[in-house]
Each structure stands twice: as C-alpha cells, then as structure tokens.
Design a protein with these regions (language model features):
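Post-Walker A alpha-helix
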Residues: 1-3
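Short beta-strand-centered segment that lines the nucleotide-binding/catalytic pocket of NTP-utilizing
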Residues: 8-22
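Hydrophobic/aromatic beta-strand patches that form the interior of the parallel beta-sheet core
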Residues: 13, 32, 99-101, 144-147
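Short glycine-/polar-rich loops that comprise or flank the Walker A/P-loop
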Residues: 10, 94-99, 140-142
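Conserved phosphate-donor/acceptor-positioning beta-strand/loop module used by diverse small-molecule
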Residues: 78-83, 93-117
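ATP-dependent small-molecule kinase phosphotransfer cores
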Residues: 19-77, 83
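Switch/connector loops and helix/strand junctions flanking conserved nucleotide-binding motifs
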Residues: 23, 87-89, 108-113, 154-157
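NTP-dependent small-molecule kinase module
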Residues: 112-119, 136-168
Length: 168
C-alpha cells in the first residue's frame, strides 16, 4: 500500500529488519536488511524510534524505524508500523503530526496474502496469531480505519486514504 501511495507523491520511510530477503525485495528499497549484531548495536546507540522482535519459525527477526527518518519525515511521508510502534513514536515525538490509518484485513485475506508471498503454513499461522494479539482493540487509537479485504479495489482503498489525509 505504501508503494502504491508513492504514485501520488508520497515517500515511503524504509525501515530496518534482520529477516532474510524474500523474492523480489531490494536492499534499501523494501527494507534496510542488516545483521542481528548491527541491529542490536543500533538499539544500544538509540538509533531506533521504535523496534520489535518476533520469534518466528526461522529464528528471531527484528524490525525497527530510524528516529532520524521519523524526525525528518514530512506530510507526504508514509511508514508501516505495528500498533506498539505507533505508540512508541507518539511517545518519543509527541509534537510530530502523525495520522494513523489502520488498514484492516480479515483473517481469510491475511492468510491468502501471506501464503501468496511465499510464507509457509507455520509462519502464516504464527503471523496471524501475532497480528491478532498486536492489533487487538487498536481501532480506537487509529485516526481512520480503512478496510482492505480480498476483493476490495486497491484504487478505492487509496482514495479513502488520500481523502482522509488531505482533509487532515
């Protein structure tokens, strides 16, 4: 979704991860792919505005967002975060104007999309369980909820996002 918004002049803030690249992903475009040691050093250095680790079927994967990138973000910047990542950034940068749009997917849509990108069955199940816990009761914190289920027209989803952001 963030990449699609680039067609409308928005810039994606590229986040960091230690997980292996998937087919078609590119260094410094999809993510900044770094080693676990480098990631942990960046945590110690206070580099991240927010970060999270996941215990996956392939090991521990870390994800995080650069504090500097968030501080330098403008009104045309987009970042994908977990609810806790959003909370962490709001806490660290309370004066930053951040609009939170929750892209809701039902479980069937999540399963299809995760499987389509090549995740195995165990990883799909782990991810869904994790997301259900992470996003529980998050609707009340979001500024806008946009439903993005299977069969939803991508242009319709983009229009709802743009209409909301441009009115904010």
């Amino acid at each position: 979704m963030a990449r699609k918004l680039e067609e409308y002049g928005y810039k994606t803030i590229v986040t960091y991860t230690t997980r292996p690249k998937r087919k078609g992903e590119k260094q410094d475009i999809t993510y900044h792919f770094i080693s676990e040691d480098d990631f942990k050093q960046k945590i110690d250095d206070g580099f991240f505005a927010e970060w999270k680790s996941y215990i996956t079927n392939e090991g521990v994967w870390y994800y995080g967002s650069s504090l500097e990138d968030i501080e330098n973000a403008d009104d045309k910047s987009v970042i994908i975060l977990t609810p806790q990542g959003y909370r962490d950034i709001k806490e660290k940068l309370p004066d930053k104007n951040i609009a939170c749009i929750y892209l809701y997917e039902n479980i069937d849509t999540m399963k299809k999309r995760l499987s389509k990108r090549g995740d195995d069955h165990k990883e799909v199940e782990r991810r869904i369980k994790s997301d259900l816990e992470d996003f529980k009761n998050f609707e009340s914190e979001a500024d806008k909820i946009v439903y993005n289920n299977d069969g939803t027209d991508i242009e319709e989803v983009i229009k709802k996002i743009l209409d909301f952001v441009e009115d904010k």
